[in-house]
Amino acid sequence: MAVARAGVLGVQWLQRASWNVMPLGARTASHMTKDMFPGPYPRTPEERAAAAKKYNMRVEDYEPYPDDGMGYGDYPKLPDRSQHERDPWYSWDQPDLRLNWGEPMHWHLDMFNRNRVDTSPILVSWNVMCMQLFGFLAFMIFMCWVGEVYPVYQPVGPKQYPYNNLYLERGGDPSKEPERVVHYEI
């Protein structure tokens, strides 16, 4: 028991001693630098120009989110367009996100990536889609009504049974010979 306790204390001492020398790999991989965080909301034209340069944008195109206390800071307000609308044949630096190096990402990129919301314009208007849907449903209801009013059956002949039309099974007298039933003529 004492050996196990000494081993645990030794491991804890080693962890504390190595903490100041070299941080764990998971902590360094998840660490964000100060350049990755948005800065304070730009109040002057010089601050707007510096923020536009920080995000590789022209000053004319740069517009920050409104300073409403949500913590957006100087991050640029990009148009709410999904990545479906971006050119799929362009040679992107990051093709799965359709982004180039240094290009600012949308604040809600997790919502506008290619397997989520598609904001690309639809080819058919909602009025036309609704007309087609309800027209098809009305046609199918009409056809079901016609089928109920005017039923159609396959023409059939009389039922034919083997063994002299099942004479014994239908209660015929076994002592009498049943009359022969011919189902066809050659």
From Swiss-Prot:
Transit peptide: 1-28
Chain ranges passing through the membrane: 133-153
GO biological process, one term: mitochondrial electron transport, NADH to ubiquinone
Keyword S-adenosyl-L-methionine: no
GO cellular component: mitochondrial inner membrane; respiratory chain complex I
Compartments it resides in: Mitochondrion inner membrane
Record keyword Transport present: yes
Membrane topology: Single-pass membrane protein
Main localization (coarse): mitochondrion
Keywords: Electron transport, Membrane, Mitochondrion, Mitochondrion inner membrane, Respiratory chain, Transit peptide, Transmembrane, Transmembrane helix, Transport
Cystine residue pairs: none
Pfam families reported for this sequence: NDUF_B8
Stated role: Accessory subunit of the mitochondrial membrane respiratory chain NADH dehydrogenase (Complex I), that is believed not to be involved in catalysis. Complex I functions in the transfer of electrons from NADH to the respiratory chain. The immediate electron acceptor for the enzyme is believed to be ubiquinone.
Summary of subunit composition and partner proteins: Complex I is composed of 45 different subunits.
Similarity remark: Belongs to the complex I NDUFB8 subunit family.
Protein name per UniProt: NADH dehydrogenase [ubiquinone] 1 beta subcomplex subunit 8, mitochondrial
